[in-house]
Amino acid sequence: MAEKKEFVVGIDLGTTNSVIAWMKPDGTVEVIPNAEGSRITPSVVAFTKSGEILVGEPAKRQMILNPERTIKSIKRKMGTDYKVRIDDKEYTPQEISAFILKKLKKDAEAYLGGEIKKAVITCPAYFNDAQRQATKEAGIIAGLEVLRIINEPTAAALAYGLDKAGKEQKVLVYDLGGGTFDVSILEIGDGVIEVIATAGNNHLGGDDFDQRLIDWMAEEFKKQHGIDLREDRQALQRLRDAAEKAKIELSTKMETDVSLPFIAVSPSGQPLHLEMRITRSLFESLTRDLVEMTRGPIEQALNDAKLSPQDIDEIILVGGMTRVPMVQRFIKEFFGKEPNKSVNPDEAVAIGAAIQAAILAGTEGAKGRDIVLVDVTPLTLGIEVKGGLFEPIIPRNTKIPVRKSKIFTTVEDGQTEVEIRVYQGERPIARENIFLGSFKLVGIPPAPRGVPQIEVTFDIDSDGIVHVSAKDLGSGKEQSMVVTGRHKLSEEDIKRMIEDAKRYEEQDKRLKEEIELKNRADDLAYSVEKTLREHGDKIPADLKSKLENMIKELRDAINRNDIPRVKMLFDDLQKESMKIGEYLYKSATGGEATNQ
């Protein structure tokens, strides 16, 4: 029996819809239709009362009858502790996402007549490491070897063939999907695609446009009949479907009719029907502010990249919402040029993922095509050090994959373990940043403080997942962790943290200087105390007693956080401790020290 042929695919695992594609031997990319014949699969999973699991269009179709057992937009929960409870079983977001991936895989295998074992899966540029790890886990649960997790805007740029343009260019990707808005600026040239800035709003998308239509129709119906359809889940589901359909039709038509017979029953028992005409101008007046909400993230991305709208060579569209004429007009007015509409915006990300999958797998169609994808870290990564300071190890906007190390030491004599506390953020004080996790390195041989050498390494792989390790260079003992932090950072979180760092710059600087002063004072007290302990017999008793008192006073001031007194006592102890050296030299030379 002949072995089944193996295929590698690219998958756009979307909030609202998902798409799967592959690269043919001739180098063209085909979007693979599902069992229902559609190239787009709704990211919806349903559990019927009989125990059947429905995915995609069949799940979406029965949402009206089974709203409590139907899950949509699970992508929003990736990387969190959220669980879906159906009957007596709980499902993680990864497991729900895996049902979607399994359907895509199964339908594509039936279409291609072979096996799919390897895939590239996409995620938003601003997914943090926990969300990326969850995406990878969903792929593994679905029976896929995930070759790479790549950023959606990067995939879109590949789909538009911009890596083959033969010139350096700045490209802006405007991605307005079902649940999220992302804007990314890429630098493309010589086969390298680099993400140089990203921004967005992870609570703005097609769902919000639908909601405006739902609310308008519900309010009109309420005015006519005194019944709020939004209070009946089945009626609301029918409204939602009608709103989505109307929105799609209004991208090509100037008006559309909505007809929902038997949507409700009057208090007297009469069946009520919803019949309405919606014009494009009405739709635009209801949603104009939503389109306007995309302006801020565009300006932020341009600002971060230090570019003006005129510096952008190409604007590419991703997400079905970019078909809306008002969205396209807004983009044209903002940039003064037409966006590139050469690729189906619903399919661009999956097409790009398929291209990258083919390159990584070395398939026939990808021969001669080599691309380096360069992503960046959204926030600085580092650890907490003495006094609660944040010590950066990988700065914000560092290109990944990356590996960086720093050497640290102990703060107490005889210390046999250290806790490595990992943070992400831009503030110099650790507690003001996002805590990602911690682990302990134990078994450090006892030694005076400052002697052990502990190498802390941060390693961010090509999927953006962070690995942290600590190694005692003396004993070779090592401990590590993969950062799967519970904190889901949205674009707004990232923006807020960067703005906070600017806003509190003066306050943070003062606090950092105070902590550094206390650390230096503590180090000096320790050093002088150690010298007195080791060489006390060579130092006059009155000086020794004076220094011991000064050390005690300095430590008291540190503990009381009396900064002016710490500064004064630190300076005094520094000057007074100089005398130790004189006596040690006298002792060593047997007399007066002479100037050279």
Swiss-Prot record:
Q: Which residues carry this modification: Phosphothreonine?
A: 180
The family database entries (CDD domains) matched by this protein are listed as:
ASKHA_NBD_HSP70_DnaK-like (cd10234)
Q: What is this protein called?
A: Chaperone protein DnaK
Query: What inducers act on this gene?
Result: By stress conditions e.g. heat shock.
UniProt keywords (A-Z) are: ATP-binding, Chaperone, Nucleotide-binding, Phosphoprotein, Stress response
Keyword Plastid in record? no
Role noted for this protein: Acts as a chaperone.
PROSITE patterns on file: HSP70_1, HSP70_2, HSP70_3
User: Which GO MF terms does the UniProt record name?
Assistant: ATP binding; ATP-dependent protein folding chaperone; unfolded protein binding
Record-linked InterPro entries:
ATPase_NBD, Chaperone_DnaK, Heat_shock_70_CS, HSP70_C_sf, HSP70_peptide-bd_sf, Hsp_70_fam
Q: Which Pfam families match?
A: HSP70 (PF00012)
Q: Which family does it belong to?
A: Belongs to the heat shock protein 70 family.
Q: Which residues form a coiled coil?
A: none
Presence of keyword Chaperone = yes
